[in-house]
Amino acid sequence: MVFYMYNMMMNLNLLKEMRTNNKLVLNKLVLKNLLYWINKDTFKENMKIYSNYNNNYMNTNLQNKNIKRINNKLYRYMPIQSEWSNKLITKLYITNIKNMNKLLFKNIINNNNNDNFNIINLFNNKYNNNNIMMNLLMFKYLTGWSTQLKGRYTNNMSRTNTTVNKSGTFNNKKYTFIKNNYKLNYISANHNISNLYNVNKNGKYNLKIKLNYI
């Protein structure tokens, strides 16, 4: 009886240990998967697909079904992108621009012996107020994507169908720097812009999906 109880206790301890090890292994796998996507390098690549379509298929199936299918798949990730953009990307972006402004004026003051007249002249000559946001831009952020169908016929006539989808990274917010209002990616969130033309001839078309950045 004692030996039986001892075996039961050993088996229970072994099962607990196996469960603990399984949890640890599972947690490591989950963490590894998360770190892969968090630390994954961002890149952009154009995808090109060449196919022949007749007039009816081009005007109905390809435009109305395939492009919508692509957009629907991409829009699934919009809530995640918006959440991260609003809380993390925007905060980091604004903080870096403020730090750059502090360094900018500090260097101007130090290099001109606190001469206000020289400070103003140096600033006006070196920096253009219209382009200052481009000079302060340090990172590239995804603003959306565009789907383009472009083809050329035997008589040298071309047809291009383009669908542009934009998602505002900074959620349509304005920020003030150096007594001027600058728009940071001032794009309406989840706004669709379509430029579609009816294709009335048969031909070969190139389908290209491009990611748009600022």
UniProtKB/Swiss-Prot annotation:
It is found in: Mitochondrion. The keyword Mitochondrion applies. The keyword Mitochondrion applies. Keywords: Mitochondrion, Ribonucleoprotein, Ribosomal protein. GO terms for cellular component: mitochondrion; ribonucleoprotein complex; ribosome. Its main location: mitochondrion. GO terms for biological process: translation. One of its GO terms (molecular function) is structural constituent of ribosome. Belongs to the universal ribosomal protein uS3 family. Essential for mitochondrial protein synthesis and required for the maturation of small ribosomal subunits. This is Small ribosomal subunit protein uS3m. The lineage of its organism: Eukaryota, Fungi, Dikarya, Ascomycota, Saccharomycotina. The gene is VAR1.
